[in-house]
Amino acid sequence: MHCALMGGSFDPPHNGHLALALAARELLNVECLFLSPSRNPFKGESLLDDVHRIQLVELLAKEVNRTGSGCEVCRWEIEQAAPSYTVELISYLTQSYPTWRFTLILGEDNFHSFHLWKEYQEILRLCHVAVFRRSSEAVVPSLDEAMLVQEGVSFYNFDAPLSSTDIRKQLRAGLPVNGLLPASILRYIEQEGLYR
């Protein structure tokens, strides 16, 4: 089985996350997609509590599954006592599902610093990496794309210019966010009084 992994803070999950999940599922031809909410030790702003973030990501998975099946939430990262690293999550998944192939989904912004990630070479050994880049941005000239493809990295053009940070600011300011979030996620945020 081929499974893709999409991690992030998902604070909150938005239509860009949904579009990326749907595009990745089709372009990568995967049978399953794990959404992994994380505790990013490098994010300055505090995250919504874990219970709400898991619920929001569950709603995102349901939205993805409206057009097919196979999307589920991987809770391993968020259940760790301390922030974890991507290599630890992928090691856990490859040990838990030894016959599966995994593809890690990255945005181009994260890929630019990928060589600084903990044990990034081990990540490349354990799984394929799919980089979704903005079609309007040029590839960083210092990256040898041909060499990276040989190491198991593939590139796809994808543009969804939404930001969870900007959406949180709009919600806190009482500005409308219609069209930025799936309706089920917006409903949950409003019912729970989040991001005020």
From Swiss-Prot:
Its EC number is 2.7.7.18. GO terms for molecular function: ATP binding; nicotinate-nucleotide adenylyltransferase activity. Pathway: Cofactor biosynthesis; NAD(+) biosynthesis; deamido-NAD(+) from nicotinate D-ribonucleotide: step 1/1. It holds the Pfam family CTP_transf_like. It catalyses: nicotinate beta-D-ribonucleotide + ATP + H(+) = deamido-NAD(+) + diphosphate. The keyword Secreted does not apply. GO terms for biological process: NAD biosynthetic process. It comes from the Bacteria. Keywords: ATP-binding, NAD, Nucleotide-binding, Nucleotidyltransferase, Pyridine nucleotide biosynthesis, Transferase. Belongs to the NadD family. HAMAP family: NaMN_adenylyltr. PANTHER family: NICOTINATE-NUCLEOTIDE ADENYLYLTRANSFERASE-RELATED, PHOSPHOPANTETHEINE ADENYLYLTRANSFERASE. Catalyzes the reversible adenylation of nicotinate mononucleotide (NaMN) to nicotinic acid adenine dinucleotide (NaAD). This is Probable nicotinate-nucleotide adenylyltransferase. The gene is nadD.
